[in-house]
Amino acid sequence: MADTERILDAAGELFASRGVAAVDMSDIARASGCSRATLYRCFDNRAALRAAYVHREARTVANRLAELTAAIEDPRERLLTGITHALRLVRESPPLSAWFADTAMGAQAAASSDVVLAMTASFLLGLDGADREAATRRARWLVRVLASFLTVPGRDADEERSMLEEFVAPLIGGRTTTLAR
């Protein structure tokens, strides 16, 4: 476990400094102070390492979002606050924001991660109690929307919040009355 965390920490530092696409397994082995054999014992290949990194960081962001939104009772406000905080947390993290410097890589990582999808669906289930299938469908769409905001940001946080209020909040609840003002 310690090797895995050390490797993922080193990968994050490299992603932030060089960009995700520029980092290979030998770079990560060297930066983490482990042999390539140890690296490959922990991760079958670069795709597996990247997925593990995304999943670990997604859990960290999800835990932080749970703390930041726990006291918000209004589902609409919890949704909007959760999304705006998620965007901020990713943007403020150099290793995470590096994923979205190459738009295809970040969007692909987010959209293909079962962990990101499951955590987003769980967040949505907590808003309106929809069934898991509906929440998962909405989560797939919401992850794409978030990837869009991360790759093509609005002019400022207020503009993004306005777009979320106008377009996302009414749709994500599945019924405009669920999350409408």
Q: For each of these PLM feature ranges, what is it?
A:
Residues M1-A31, A48-A51:
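Basic, helix-initiating cap at the start of DNA-binding domains
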Residues M1-G12, D158-S162, A169-R181:
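Actinobacteria-biased recognition of intrinsically disordered, low-complexity terminal regions
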Residues I7-F15, V61, L65, A86, ...:
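Short hydrophobic clusters on alpha-helical segments that form packing/core surfaces
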Residues S32-F43:
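Short hydrophobic/aromatic patch on the recognition helix
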Residues R50-E57, V61:
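Alpha-helical DNA-contacting segments of helix-turn-helix folds
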Residues A52, A66-R91, A139:
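Hydrophobic alpha-helical connector segments
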Residues A62, T81, M105-R140:
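Amphipathic alpha-helical packing segments from all-alpha helical-bundle domains
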Residues R88-L96, L125-L127, R140-E159, P170-L179:
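Amphipathic C-terminal alpha-helical segment
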